[in-house]
Design a protein with these regions (language model features):
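Short, basic/aromatic recognition patches
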Residues: 1-21
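Charged, gly/pro-rich active-site loop segments
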Residues: 2-3, 78-142
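A generic local structural motif
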Residues: 4-7, 31-32, 58-60, 115
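Amphipathic alpha-helical interface surfaces
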Residues: 8, 57-64, 103-107
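A generic structural signal for nonpolar/aromatic side chains embedded in well-ordered alpha-helices
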Residues: 12, 64-65, 111, 129
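Short connector loops at helix/strand junctions that flank enzyme active sites
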Residues: 13-15, 29-31, 39-41, 57-60, ...
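Short beta-strand segments
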Residues: 15-53, 73-75
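Helix-adjacent hinge/juxtasegments
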Residues: 46-76, 80-81
């Protein structure tokens, strides 16, 4: 059953990781797992951290967003034993490449408060994306 937008947004805010999809100019959709945080103004912060090794200082998702600012964040809940608990939420996003430093700093603080690994804010950057639309579905009543 389709989730009300408020319920879909609440699940997005409460969830702690998802799949960020950006658009590669040649390959099409690039999907990567990410940690994220959502602020009360409807912005999503996705860290580019120094915790995990990276192949490059500039990630492909960043290059993709420079070419095409559209992105999608997909979160879901899967219960193999009880399919009545299945749900997913999709947030359509727009990159805010030139976002105000204060917004990026606030999202960085939110990430630090949410994830122990980010307590010391080991970020190279925080990608700032504005929520354009949120939709969702759940097997059971919302």
């Amino acid at each position: 059953m389709r989730l009300a937008e408020s319920e879909a947004r609440a699940r997005l805010v409460a969830h702690d990781h998802g799949i960020l999809c950006t658009v590669h100019v040649e390959r099409g959709v690039d999907a990567v797992p990410v940690a994220y945080v959502v602020d009360e103004d409807g912005y999503v912060g996705v860290p580019v951290d120094r915790v995990k090794p990276k192949a490059s200082s500039r990630l492909q998702r960043e290059r993709n967003l420079e070419e095409d600012p559209r992105a999608t964040l997909l979160v879901e809940h899967w219960d193999r034993g009880d399919w009545s608990q299945l749900w997913w939420v999709r947030a359509e996003l727009r990159s805010q490449g030139g976002a105000a430093p204060a917004r990026a700093a606030a999202l960085a603080a939110g990430l630090a408060g949410r994830y122990a690994q980010y307590r010391d804010q080991p970020f190279a950057r925080v990608l700032v994306l504005r929520i354009v639309r949120v939709t969702g579905w759940a097997a059971g009543a919302s």
